[in-house]
């Protein structure tokens, strides 16, 4: 365990359930981000921050254990980022999204060469998010 003596925060070792990665994705338009992440993908806004009125937003959105930080700030994140997520329920989630008939995204779903069922969505800011679920191992001869 590592100790930060400046503020006495204790960190869990990597891989022992105390770690979480949260990608920072660059956005350029708050309304389009809400339409995509909240209205279509079904995430919820955990919090938003502005340094003052009429300044760029920095916010966290979540769906289950998945979190993204979305930032309008110049220099935060790089447009064109690709986030790869292992999760469960990919087929049902894909069906839910397709049934919403979002005009700007109709992702296909596929079995991948690495043994997953997967689909990828593209946000309005050129970021890609791939949702992947491990398929059961195929038995020899089946």
Where are these regions (language model features)?
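Core segments of cupin and vicinal oxygen chelate
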Residues: 17-18, 24-67
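Conserved beta-strand in the GNAT
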Residues: 69-71, 120, 130
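A short linear hydrophobic-aromatic micro-motif
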Residues: 44-47, 70, 105-108
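Vicinal oxygen chelate
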Residues: 3-6, 29-31, 83-128
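Short, charged/polar surface micro-motifs in flexible loops or helix N-caps
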Residues: 64-68, 75-77, 89-92
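N-terminal beta-strand motif that seeds the catalytic metal site of vicinal oxygen chelate
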Residues: 1-34, 46, 81-83, 134-142
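Short acidic/glycine-enriched loop/turn segments that link adjacent beta-strands
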Residues: 52-57, 77-79, 112-117
